[in-house]
Amino acid sequence: LAKHFTLIAWDQRGAGLAYSKKEAKNLTLTKELYVEDAHNIVLWAKEKFNKDKIIIVGHSFGSVLGVWLAEKYPEDILAYVGVGQCVDYIRNEDLSYAWTLEKAEELGDKKALKVLQKISPPKNGMYKENHRKSIIKQRAILHKYGGANYSSRKPYWQELLFHELPIMLKEYSVLQIIKYIKGVSYSPN
């Protein structure tokens, strides 16, 4: 893409390099806030590059955000491309939790069962108590069973260390990488 387009890589609030310990304590992340932040980036890009409309590419949670953005501000979006597109994140959360619980029961993983029962199933895509911490716990168990990427059973930290970190070292300072890792652990996205 970089050979043919100007790319703007953006970590939404609380994620990746946008993580701020102070902001993490005092900020409630909402759909509206995410959409307005993204729209501000679009407006900036339109002005900076003298374009009437912008092409948006969204990955993972960014694919949800991309759809929300295109829906609310179609006049600013030339095209939207979803990569790893989330189609029904509420159903996705339900299926993810159910699969993880089923695997824990099947494997007799008492520790995982205790964690999953404590956080309880999501309602409308959200865990009832401390959604961020609950989703991180659920995802850790999901990943342990290979549900996040069935071709790999490595813990996330190993994937980060051996796959993502060498790539990141080419573009980020060590301080930025530390901030990124903190942001990943803060944001469920």
Feature locations, PLM:
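Conserved alpha/beta-hydrolase
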Residues: 1-20
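Alpha/beta-hydrolase
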Residues: 107-189
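Structured segments of extracytoplasmic/periplasmic soluble domains
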Residues: 4, 41-48, 72, 83, ...
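Short, solvent-exposed loop/turn and secondary-structure capping segments
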Residues: 18-22, 68-69, 91-95, 171
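Conserved acidic catalytic loop of the alpha/beta-hydrolase fold
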Residues: 33-53
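Conserved hydrolase catalytic core segment
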Residues: 52-91
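A catalytic-pocket lid/entrance helix-loop region that shapes and gates access to the active site
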Residues: 75-123
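Cap/lid segment of the alpha/beta-hydrolase catalytic domain
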Residues: 14-32
